[in-house]
Amino acid sequence: VERSRGLGDVYKRQEKDDTDMPTKRPHDYAGYCDAAPVDRGENLRRDICLTLEQMDIFPESSRHETGPGQNEIDFQYSNALKAADNLVTFKNVVKSVADRNGLYATFMPKPIVDNCGSGLHIMLMCMKGTENVFRPQLGGLSKEAERMIAGILKNVGDMTLFLNTTTNSYKRFGSLLAPKYISWSHENYAQLLRAPLADTDENGIILRSADNTCNPYFAMGLLIYACIDGVINKEELPKPFNFNIGSADENELAKLETLPQSLKEAVERAEKSEFLADRLPEHMLERFIAIEKELIICLLYTSPSPRDLSTS
């Protein structure tokens, strides 16, 4: 997998009080793709994009998202390492520019109850020579593309701990448009993974479960390993799930495996995972799991946990 796209980063902005501390009051109450004057973030998004361009990071698009004070900036494709670097820089730029404008930017997955959470949509494209493996052939995906998707679906439950690292992450799953089930579709936007059949050189797949609490280097590396695992083991891609998750029959949903629904469950999956044990150094995996267990204990005494806030 050689190229990853600017990750569909979603963030929320909150106003500060007179003591320069962030409040729970959103900067605006605009909706998806709203415009000024309802969308009060247009100038700030422009400032962020221009700052990124000065740092040789070129946004592809920006807009107001569904939630109050929620915004999204997408990047152009780059190689996986560069995409991870860009995300780290992007988060710092967003927080700095927001602070300069008297606002507090949070990447917390579920900062406002009963409103859309903020995810990190990771878009993957794979080049084989000069050809895009995910570009449709005769109206469908190539066998290699299908096996890569199958590899991700097979291993995504095990790697969820690395894609969603805080207790707050799991409050987003299954809420409103956020994924809960391990499923895929060509066009249904509610599924965990979407594989469009767009006849373009930049067609790729989109994983919708990750959030901005993840270490992007771990996330990218594990997703690449999952794709390779699918190809090597010739994993078979299950049938697409084209039903609306919210109105699907319970018998149909019962056939689907779910993502871990809590940090504790994600830790348990990771501890038992042969996939992670084979791909990560033993000391690194053990240390990461130990840190996450400490976070679970911390939650018993405070909510949200310090880790939730520090990664937001």
Regions found by a protein language model. Give the residues of each.
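Beta-rich nucleic-acid/ligand-interaction surfaces
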Residues: P68-D74, P109-I122, T167-A178
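Catalytic-core signal marking the mid-to-C-terminal active-site face
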Residues: S96-V97, L103-Y104, M127-S303
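Single conserved hydrophobic/aromatic residue that forms the stacking wall/gate
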Residues: V1-Y11, Y301-S312
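A short glycine-rich, hydrophobically flanked beta-strand micro-motif that places a catalytic Asp/Glu
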Residues: G8-D9, S61-H64, Y104-I112
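Active-site neighborhood of thiol-dependent amide/isopeptide-bond enzymes
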Residues: Y77-T89, I112-V113
